């Protein structure tokens, strides 16, 4: 389509616009050109907070409304952040105000947007083909919803339920098209089959629909019950009977090899369910840890927010101080006032550009939808009065500003709704793809592991339980050993410290005694020299008798000194021998303690390795539990959808039966009337014949 369209506005009466507010008429009627081009939006949708509108803004608005509605050329680029630019680019498509119900077919809750539902009487191969076709159709529909606003008129034929006051399209065939579309959507509501259902129908044996709900474990935790839908228990028994009948009719026709495979798959499913019960305690622990971590995360986020607020407060104080310093000088105040005025003008200009752009967008969508006017209709159109002054609702800001602001608020709300819906659709698509991939992986795993027997599965379960119990016992033993090792290590350290202190004291005493011995030896040598010198002197000076008496005295003194010294030396030797013995014993104790510590360290390393292996096994089991929980939730959702569809089909069947009964009654009444009329005609003919014969 071209970028310009002729402006189309149909009028049947002169008072057609009596129910429309005056402020909305210029956006649709005052354009002198027949088309309005699409223009890029301004850079910033929220340039500044609200300020009182100036006379310049009123003049620009009045000129833009009374003149041409061609978009104003974009000014020089201002310094905007990346977020503002991306936000402005994302708001290029606006939802129209006058045709707000026109985009209702894009709403995710409508009939066309819902996924079709499987019809009851179809085979598995047809269901798989329908799944692939429906996936392709949904992808094409989603891509089509993201197209540009300029669309063909045939694409817009789905939304003919709109009763626009001032815009009536010419296409009268839209009601028929809408009815056909509704019939197609109602028929297509029975065309999709969930992957879980199709695969379960090829795997479940006879009577599995009746035995499967009873095999499920009754005691569940509160968290699992909250995740499952509460309505499953009410309709589980009749649904299982119906599904068992359907599946039994199918499985009777199949080969015995398929029956054996289904038996194996059912046994595998029972084993998996029993493993879920064993691993549920681990899931609880993980959830508690996740809650603790989430609480810590919230506290950290609160701290970050408080710090950011504190930083903002400091920045505001700095700006305030800078402004106070700038306002102190006269030139700075003039410059700041001029800058404020310039900023106000720029912000008002941006706001006016945004309003003009939105009005142009709405007008272009309107022109893209409706036909152009003929020459006669264009001649009859009069947006402004030919004679007299302009009406006040066209130029006075008191009338226009509230209407335009309300119009902008309405458009912003619509834009937010569109964005939220698109994000939800994208997230749902991603989740659906992940679920499909997980289902495929699970089915491949089940097909690979179908060769395992029930005994082996039970043995594996018992081994897993024993391993878990052993892990718990080992963990407790490790904790006890850690505590004992810490206590022993602390005791040994204290004893070693005491012994080392004693050794140091003994070594100090030994050194002091050795020093005393050396001093005494020196004194002994000095005494010997003096004795010899005195003896020589006495020999020359003293007589023999005197000398003998003196020598006897000296000998006695020497003997006494020697006895004392020998006693002291013996005591010191005894002490030294005792100290050496104690030192040897302490060294032996120290070596024994070191060997014991090394042995304990090796045991700790081995226990840590075993603990790591156990933790890895526990993490693998936790992941398996989470996968099984997600699969169970998906299965519950699919079952809920199937039950709702079954209820809808039963309701429609009852309605059709009532219609058929009423039609049969009407038919019988008509037949009785026809018979009575024929009888009356026969009687009248006989009477006529009788009258003819009489005449």
UniProtKB/Swiss-Prot annotation:
Residues 34-49 have a biased composition (Pro residues). Residues 24-54, 66-147, 167-272 are annotated as: Disordered. GO terms for biological process: chemical synaptic transmission; cilium assembly; mitochondrion organization. Disulfide bonds: none annotated. Keywords: Cilium biogenesis/degradation, Coiled coil, Cytoplasm, Cytoskeleton, Mitochondrion. It is found in: Cytoplasm, Cytosol; Cytoplasm, Cytoskeleton, Microtubule organizing center, Centrosome; Cytoplasm, Cytoskeleton, Spindle pole; Cytoplasm, Cytoskeleton, Microtubule organizing center, Centrosome, Centriole. Residues 124-146, 178-189 have a biased composition (Acidic residues). Its main location: cytoplasm. InterPro entries: CEP89. Residues 276-368, 406-632 form a coiled coil. One of its GO terms (cellular component) is synapse. Residues 251-271 have a biased composition (Basic and acidic residues). Residues 209-226 have a biased composition (Polar residues). The keyword Mitochondrion applies. Required for ciliogenesis. Also plays a role in mitochondrial metabolism where it may modulate complex IV activity. This is Centrosomal protein of 89 kDa. It comes from Danio rerio (Zebrafish).
């Amino acid at each position: 389509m071209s970028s310009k369209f002729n402006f189309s506005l149909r009028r049947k009466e002169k008072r057609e616009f009596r129910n429309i507010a005056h402020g909305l008429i210029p956006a649709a009627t005052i354009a002198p050109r027949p088309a309005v081009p699409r223009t890029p939006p301004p850079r910033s949708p929220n340039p500044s907070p609200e300020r009182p509108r100036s006379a310049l803004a009123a003049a620009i608005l009045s000129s833009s409304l009374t003149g041409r509605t061609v978009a104003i050329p974009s000014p020089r680029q201002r310094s905007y952040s990346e977020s503002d630019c991306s936000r402005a680019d994302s708001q290029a498509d606006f939802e129209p105000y006058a045709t707000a119900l026109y985009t209702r077919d894009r709403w995710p809750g409508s009939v066309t947007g819902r996924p079709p539902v499987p019809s009851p009487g179809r085979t598995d191969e047809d269901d798989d083909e329908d799944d692939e076709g429906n996936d392709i159709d949904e992808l094409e529909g989603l891509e089509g919803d993201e197209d540009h606003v300029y669309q063909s008129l045939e694409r817009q034929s789905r939304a003919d339920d709109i009763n626009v006051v001032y815009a009536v399209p010419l296409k009268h065939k839209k009601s028929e098209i809408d009815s056909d579309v509704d019939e197609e959507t109602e028929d297509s509501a029975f065309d999709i089959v969930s992957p879980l259902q199709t695969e379960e129908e090829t795997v479940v044996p006879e009577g599995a629909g009746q035995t499967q709900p009873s095999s499920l474990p009754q005691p569940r935790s509160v968290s699992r019950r909250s995740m499952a839908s509460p309505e499953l228990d009410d309709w589980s028994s009749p649904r299982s009977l119906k599904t068992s009948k359907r599946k039994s009719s199918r499985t009777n026709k199949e080969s015995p090899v398929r029956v054996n495979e289904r038996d194996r798959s059912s046994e595998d499913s029972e084993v998996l369910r029993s493993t879920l019960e064993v691993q549920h305690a681990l899931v609880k622990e993980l959830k508690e840890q996740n809650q603790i971590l989430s609480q810590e995360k919230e506290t950290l986020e609160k701290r970050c927010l408080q710090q950011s607020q504190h930083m903002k407060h400091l920045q505001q104080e700095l700006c305030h101080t800078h402004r106070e310093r700038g306002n102190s000088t006269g030139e700075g105040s003039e410059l700041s006032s001029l800058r404020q005025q310039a900023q106000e003008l720029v912000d008002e200009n941006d706001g006016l550009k945004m309003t003009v752009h939105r009005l142009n967008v709405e007008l272009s969508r309107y022109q893209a939808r409706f036909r152009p006017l003929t020459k006669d209709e264009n001649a009859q159109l009069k947006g402004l009065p030919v004679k007299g002054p302009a009406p006040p609702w066209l130029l006075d800001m008191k009338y226009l500003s509230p209407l335009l602001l309300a119009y902008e608020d309405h458009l912003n709300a619509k834009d937010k709704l569109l964005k939220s819906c698109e994000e939800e659709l994208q997230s749902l698509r991603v989740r659906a793809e992940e679920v499909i991939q997980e289902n495929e992986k699970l089915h491949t795993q089940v097909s690979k592991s179908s060769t395992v027997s029930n005994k082996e599965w039970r043995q594996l379960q018992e081994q897993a339980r024993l391993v878990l119990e052993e892990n718990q016992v080992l963990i407790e033993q490790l904790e006890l050993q850690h505590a004992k090792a810490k206590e022993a290590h602390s005791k040994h350290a204290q004893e070693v410290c005491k012994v080392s202190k004693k050794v140091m004291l003994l070594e100090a005493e030994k050194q002091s005694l050795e020093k005393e011995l050396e001093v005494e030896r020196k004194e002994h040598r000095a005494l010997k020299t003096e004795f010899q010198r005195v003896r020589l002197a006495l020999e020359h000076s003293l007589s023999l008798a005197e000398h003998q008496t003196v020598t006897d005295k000296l000998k006695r003194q020497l003997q006494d000194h020697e006895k004392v010294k020998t006693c002291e030396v013996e005591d010191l030797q005894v002490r030294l021998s005792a100290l050496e013995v104690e030192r040897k014993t302490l060294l032996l104790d120290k070596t024994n303690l070191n060997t014991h510590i090394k042995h304990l360290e090796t045991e700790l390393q081995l226990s840590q390795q075993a603990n790591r292996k156990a933790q890895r096994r526990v993490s693998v089991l936790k992941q398996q539990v989470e996968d099984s929980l997600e699969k169970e939730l998906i299965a519950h959702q699919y079952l809920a959808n199937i039950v709702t569809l079954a209820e809808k089909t039963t309701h429609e069947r009852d309605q059709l039966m009532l219609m058929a009964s009423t039609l049969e009654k009407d038919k019988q009444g008509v037949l009785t009337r026809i018979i009575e009329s024929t009888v009356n005609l026969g009687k009248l003919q006989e009477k006529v014949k009788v009258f003819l014969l009489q005449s």
